[in-house]
């Protein structure tokens, strides 16, 4: 018995030693091995720094850049502001260099053909594993791989078909009219008024997704949207700690608040979905909102898969909750970003504002622009939206990671464990495709369609590409066309003297100091 303490101590020492060796493998030996493999291929980047890699320097440079707005009058070369570290890497080493995300190297890919290839090869270049903080915001379709992704995509697709989008036009209309009427009340009959449109547009798109997702229980949807906005701010404030193992489980004030907000979101969504489930089981028809369409698709597909017999549903109760959260995050944020930069650029380019208004008035007069087919015939408005998406994509880069086996991407041989950042913003401005004026606002590039604009190349990635292209892009574009048309019918607008150009954002490309514009009634 007297040997037991020595045995226990020996076992503890072995466990600690094994843990230490594993940590050294992860934090030192493996990064150095990967660095050698990347440099052998001519890829360049900074030498690996223990644990943090390039993250400290990247964060410092970004904070410095975001501390001041861009000079006025502004141009569209804002990448050095939102990601100065990567901008310096690209200038120093050229396209296809690498940086260190902690102990993981990430190759920066900006050449359009390589971006397209990586998007298309979704089974090899997968989404990185979601950290616990980000998972609180949204998992669902965007985070799934393989068979689960395919099944969920198949179930969600019908909700975004054209005939279903047409059913959501009243939800779009109601929310847009509400905001435009609020603006009109602020503008005197024969004068002008300054309105910061950014809060209004985020509220508008949140309102739209609340109505489109939950229909008759819109009030619950609105409350969920408000809580998700709070949760997003909490997550962003805590992301800097996400590299610390187990940090989210510590009893900090931020973690406690985040848990409470998440529990309330979960409770509200459970109630809404449970009530819908009971109604469907009682024989009521599925609602024509996103949740109703999704639940109906889930039931029908599950029955088909089960040969018509009562079978376990493909999408679980929690899966439905996760997809609803994703509807909110993706559905409101990306559209608000598209709308705000569209209005800002139309302020700067008054000639295009005039052309777009003339087209809207020729198509709708002063009638509400609620005809889906007529909205899609707005050629100039569509050209403008495409050019805004090219210059100010809602998401400027997308991360992927190779988990299994060595593979080639173009001439690069990428070993497993290496990340890649697909710099869609760089591909959208490649001078070889778009010309030397690639950073200038020129909607007429799209006058003869996308294929002509890109000279037959695939070099336009505002919604991603390939099998995982954004499922809600037509939803966002229809909502945006209607909102822009209605605003052009009611107002002329210009930049306020207080406007400062400051694109920023960790997730989407937001105006850091808002978007104060001067409005006049027409």
From Swiss-Prot:
The keyword Nucleus belongs to this UniProt entry's keyword annotation: no
The protein, known as: Echinocystic acid 23-monooxygenase
Broad EC category: oxidoreductase
Chain positions carrying an annotated carbohydrate: 190
UniProt pathway: Secondary metabolite biosynthesis; terpenoid biosynthesis
Key word Heme present: yes
GO CC list: membrane
Source taxonomy: Eukaryota, Viridiplantae, Streptophyta, Embryophyta, Tracheophyta
Sequence similarity: Belongs to the cytochrome P450 family.
UniProt note on tissues of expression: Mainly expressed in flowers and flower buds, to a lesser extent in young leaves and, at low levels, in old leaves, stems and roots.
Primary gene name: CYP72A984
SUPFAM superfamilies reported in the protein's UniProt record: Cytochrome P450 (SSF48264)
Main location: membrane
Membrane-spanning ranges: 4-24
UniProt keyword terms in alphabetical order: Coiled coil, Glycoprotein, Heme, Iron, Membrane, Metal-binding, Monooxygenase, Oxidoreductase, Signal-anchor, Transmembrane, Transmembrane helix
Function: Component of the oleanane-type triterpene saponins (e.g. saponarioside A and saponarioside B) biosynthetic pathway, leading to the production of natural products with detergent properties used as traditional sources of soap.
Entry-linked InterPro entries: Cyt_P450 (IPR001128), Cyt_P450_CS (IPR017972), Cyt_P450_E_grp-I (IPR002401), Cyt_P450_sf (IPR036396), Cytochrome_P450_Monooxygen (IPR050665)
GO biological process: saponin biosynthetic process; triterpenoid biosynthetic process
Gene Ontology terms, MF aspect: heme binding; iron ion binding; monooxygenase activity; oxidoreductase activity, acting on paired donors, with incorporation or reduction of molecular oxygen
EC number: 1.14.14.-
Coiled-coil features, chain-numbered ranges: none
Cofactor dependency: heme
């Amino acid at each position: 018995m007297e040997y037991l303490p020595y045995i226990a101590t020996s076992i503890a020492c072995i466990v600690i030693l094994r843990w230490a060796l594993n940590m050294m493998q992860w934090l030192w030996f493996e990064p150095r091995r990967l660095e050698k493999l990347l440099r052998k291929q001519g890829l360049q980047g900074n030498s690996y720094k223990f644990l943090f890699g390039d993250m400290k320097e990247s964060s410092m440079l970004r904070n410095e850049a975001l501390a001041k707005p861009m000079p006025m009058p502004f141009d569209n070369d804002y990448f050095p502001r939102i990601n100065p570290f990567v901008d310096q890497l690209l200038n120093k080493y050229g396209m296809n260099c690498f940086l260190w995300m902690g102990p993981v190297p990430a190759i920066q890919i900006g050449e359009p053909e390589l971006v397209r290839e990586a998007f298309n090869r979704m089974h090899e270049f997968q989404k990185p594993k979601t950290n616990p903080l980000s998972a609180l915001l949204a998992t669902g379709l965007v985070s799934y791989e393989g068979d689960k992704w395919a099944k969920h995509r198949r179930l969600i697709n019908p909700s975004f078909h054209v005939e279903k989008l047409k059913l959501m036009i009243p939800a779009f209309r109601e929310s847009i009219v509400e905001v435009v009427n609020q603006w009109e009340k602020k503008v005197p009959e024969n004068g002008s008024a300054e309105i910061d449109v950014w809060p209004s547009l985020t509220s508008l798109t949140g309102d739209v997704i609340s109505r489109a997702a939950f229909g008759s229980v819109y009030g619950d949807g609105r409350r969920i949207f408000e809580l998700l906005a709070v949760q997003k701010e909490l997550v962003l404030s805590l992301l800097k700690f996400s590299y610390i193992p187990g940090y989210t489980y510590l009893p900090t004030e931020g973690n406690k608040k985040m848990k409470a907000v998440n529990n309330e979101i979960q409770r509200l969504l459970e109630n809404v979905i449970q009530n819908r489930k009971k109604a469907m089981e009682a024989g009521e028809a599925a609602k024509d909102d996103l949740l109703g369409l999704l639940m109906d698709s889930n039931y029908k597909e599950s029955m088909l898969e089960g040969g018509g017999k009562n079978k376990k549903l493909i999408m679980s109760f929690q899966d439905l909750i996760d997809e609803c959260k994703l509807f909110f995050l993706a559905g409101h944020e990306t559209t608000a970003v598209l709308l705000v930069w569209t209005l800002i650029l139309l302020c700067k380019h008054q000639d295009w504002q005039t052309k777009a208004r003339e087209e809207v008035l020729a198509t709708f007069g002063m009638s509400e622009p609620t005809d889906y087919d007529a909205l899609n015939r707005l050629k100039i408005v569509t050209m403008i939206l495409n050019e805004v998406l090219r210059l100010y994509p809602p998401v400027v880069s997308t991360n992927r990671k190779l988990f299994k086996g060595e593979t080639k991407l173009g001439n690069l041989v990428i070993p497993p464990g290496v990340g890649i950042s697909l710099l869609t913003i760089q591909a959208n401005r490649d001078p070889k495709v778009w010309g030397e004026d690639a950073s200038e606002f020129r909607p007429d590039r799209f006058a003869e369609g996308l294929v002509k604009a890109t000279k037959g190349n695939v070099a336009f990635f505002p919604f991603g590409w390939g099998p995982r292209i954004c499922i809600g892009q037509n939803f966002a574009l229809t909502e945006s066309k209607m909102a822009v048309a209605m605003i052009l019918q009611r107002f002329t607008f210009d930049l306020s003297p207080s406007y400062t150009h400051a694109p920023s954002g960790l997730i989407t490309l937001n105006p850091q100091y808002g978007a104060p514009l001067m409005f006049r009634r027409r």
